[in-house]
Amino acid sequence: MAPSNLPPVFNATSQDIEMLLAAQCHLGSKNLQVHMEPYLWKTRPDGINVINIGKTWEKIVLAARIIAAIDNPADICVISARPYGQRAVLKFAAHTGAVAIAGRFTPGNFTNYITRSFKEPRLIIVTDPRTDSQAIKEASYVNIPVIALCDTDSPTEFVDVAIPTNNKGRHAIGLIWWMLAREVLRLRGTLANRESEWDVVVDLYFYRDPEAEENKEIEETKVPGAEEVGAAAIESGLVGDSWQAQATPGFSAGVAVPGTAVPGWEADVSTDWAASSAPAAETLADPAADPSVKW
């Protein structure tokens, strides 16, 4: 990392640098825009352009100082048409008081005063100059300064402050917005000092797939845990001695169980059957013996 041109109080800590590297904020694309060349550290053998993390931190601090200089936070508009940045801009707006536009940017928001969504911000911050080009173009018509998260292949036309970073990864985008919000709160005095940790974790700024979260909840509700299955088995008496107690002792010991005679069974067979068959025989023989019966 190149030596920093910031005052010592704004220097990045080793933890900040480790977080930027872990989120892959230093990995750009294979294409290089000529205006992004000053932020380039080197090009890897596979063609990936590596961004200078020191320049990234300097631009984060510069952007935070610009944001903190605006008296009314509602005059700041944060924009992200890229899905990976929509959750981040909403969290940034909630923590700093800015106005968020997550999703499609309606043309005419900054130029057509007849529309309901007309806004007159003093500063806009975009996640990607390529996907948010409509907002940058309209800001140039009405002289609104623009801060943008720029990759090595991002167009920098009409961008006043470019924060060099990877603006295509979900973790890189979330981390940059989280660091920007933290620096703004430090400059405003919301956080006591730079040594105090922010109680908001960076995971809140990361993109979450709604379908993946829904499927995860369904799986958790369908599959019971091992502890629940064990508890249910114990309560139903199917574990340990209870299972043997419920089973027949004779079968468990492997000894044949002698049959129990039913009282009166043989007597019923010998008497009842003979008694019931005698009248039937007589009734069958009577018609043949009687000559008066006509068939």
Swiss-Prot record:
Pfam families according to UniProt: 40S_SA_C, Ribosomal_S2
One annotated GO molecular function: structural constituent of ribosome
InterPro entries (alphabetical): Ribosomal_uS2, Ribosomal_uS2_C, Ribosomal_uS2_CS, Ribosomal_uS2_euk, Ribosomal_uS2_euk/arc, Ribosomal_uS2_flav_dom_sf
Single GO cellular component term: cytosolic small ribosomal subunit
Disulfide bonds: none
GO biological process, one term: ribosomal small subunit assembly
Keywords assigned: Cytoplasm, Ribonucleoprotein, Ribosomal protein
Compartmental location: Cytoplasm
Assembly behavior: Component of the small ribosomal subunit. Mature ribosomes consist of a small (40S) and a large (60S) subunit. The 40S subunit contains about 33 different proteins and 1 molecule of RNA (18S). The 60S subunit contains about 49 different proteins and 3 molecules of RNA (25S, 5.8S and 5S). Interacts with RPS21.
HAMAP family: Ribosomal_S2_euk
Function: Required for the assembly and/or stability of the 40S ribosomal subunit. Required for the processing of the 20S rRNA-precursor to mature 18S rRNA in a late step of the maturation of 40S ribosomal subunits.
Family, as annotated: Belongs to the universal ribosomal protein uS2 family.
Protein name (database record): Small ribosomal subunit protein uS2
Encoding gene (name): RPS0
